[in-house]
Swiss-Prot record:
Stretches for region Disordered: 1-22
Entry's family note: Belongs to the bacterial ribosomal protein bL32 family.
Full protein name: Large ribosomal subunit protein bL32
The UniProt record lists the keyword Ribosomal protein: yes
Composition bias, Basic residues: 1-16
A GO CC annotation given for this chain: large ribosomal subunit
Recorded name of the encoding gene: rpmF
Pfam family membership, one: Ribosomal_L32p
BP terms from Gene Ontology: translation
Family annotation (InterPro entries): Ribosomal_bL32, Ribosomal_bL32_bact, Ribosomal_zn-bd
Keywords linked to the UniProt accession: Ribonucleoprotein, Ribosomal protein
The keyword Ribosomal protein is assigned to this record: yes
Coiled-coil blocks: none
Organism: Brachyspira hyodysenteriae (strain ATCC 49526 / WA1)
UniProt-listed HAMAP family: Ribosomal_bL32 (MF_00340)
Amino acid sequence: MAVPKHRKSKAKKRSRQAANDKRFLGSLSICPQCGAERMPHRICPECGFYKDRVIKAPKTQNAG
């Protein structure tokens, strides 16, 4: 079985992931909670929901 000879750096990993994320820009889905566009199978960046559960706190704008 193939095993990596050297560890991939964070920059290499994130660069590869960024290239793969561009594929989904044409297939954005609508968040059922807030109606914002989001990438499929990802947490909504606006409300923080995924599959009817709060995963992270929603974005808030500071009044000051």
